[in-house]
Curated annotation (Swiss-Prot):
It comes from Cupriavidus pinatubonensis (strain JMP 134 / LMG 1197) (Cupriavidus necator (strain JMP 134)). Its main location: membrane. This is Cytochrome c biogenesis ATP-binding export protein CcmA. One of its GO terms (biological process) is cytochrome complex assembly. It is found in: Cell inner membrane. It holds the Pfam family ABC_tran. SMART domains: AAA. It comes from the Bacteria. GO terms for molecular function: ABC-type heme transporter activity; ATP binding; ATP hydrolysis activity. Part of the ABC transporter complex CcmAB involved in the biogenesis of c-type cytochromes; once thought to export heme, this seems not to be the case, but its exact role is uncertain. Responsible for energy coupling to the transport system. It is an enzyme of class 7 (translocase). ATP binds at residues 51-58. Residues 19-226 form the ABC transporter domain.
Length: 226
């Protein structure tokens, strides 16, 4: 199991805001996508980002991950403003986009080992198996990903979260293509992450159970819980 990093919580009690967005704005083609985004997340906290298609949910996550630059505003981590390519910040986050980001010619085992190497870690056969088991997909670890269903591929992508500890999860529609049993596996993984002092910012079209703050983009409208 991944080992939580230190300095974010004490005996499971949050020590104050760790991630903060300050008046964030993002534009595409000269047109504003969102403006005036302010929020903070402490250890054990989760923000659910909701809104209609085109409201900027995915763009916000990509700004937070450093893949896009904001038009204005700032992101701070542990009280320090995050600069482009900040290694300390990037090594503290895990990003799972709406697309799975998987080379389908690899097996699930090969994909997770490669993902671990990118973080400077060596994944053993057992750590990969355990990570896949957390998402209920360990039996397919040596099967080419191209032969898996969309739901199975999504679970392989999410298994990266169980393989390598990262304090901040940035997740774009994590439940896409998941059945109820697989969604329950993800909820258990998320709950454990938050109990261990982790944080998450999750873009979703359907509110996840378990609470947390809700950040509405693109105007108010009601969303049913998952």
């Amino acid at each position: 199991m991944p080992t939580p990093s230190s300095g974010l919580s004490c005996n499971g009690v949050a020590v104050g805001p760790v991630l903060r967005a300050n008046d964030l704005a993002f534009s595409r083609g000269g047109r504003p996508v969102f403006t005036g985004i302010d929020f903070s997340v402490s250890a054990g906290g989760v923000i659910q980002v909701v809104g209609p298609n085109g409201s900027g949910k995915s763009s916000l996550l990509r700004v937070l991950s450093g893949l896009l630059q904001p038009a204005s505003g700032s992101v701070s981590w542990l009280g320090k403003c995050v600069r482009a390519g900040d290694p300390a910040y990037l090594q503290s986050l895990a990003y799972v986009g709406h697309a799975d980001g998987i080379d389908t010619d690899l097996t699930a085992d090969e994909h997770l080992r490669y993902a671990a190497r990118l973080t400077g870690l060596h994944a053993t056969n057992e750590t990969v198996r355990v990570a896949l088991a957390r998402l209920g997909i360990a039996k397919t670890m040596h099967v080419p990903i191209r032969t898996l269903s969309q739901g199975q591929r999504r679970r392989v992508a999410l298994a990266r979260l169980a393989l390598v500890w990262r304090a901040l999860w940035l997740l774009d529609e994590p439940l896409t293509s998941l059945d109820d049993e697989s969604a329950a596996c993800f909820h258990d993984l998320l709950d454990e992450h938050l109990r261990d002092g982790g944080m998450a910012v999750i873009a979703t079209h359907r509110l996840l159970p378990g609470g947390g703050e809700v950040l509405q983009l693109g105007g108010a409208h009601a969303l049913p819980p998952a």
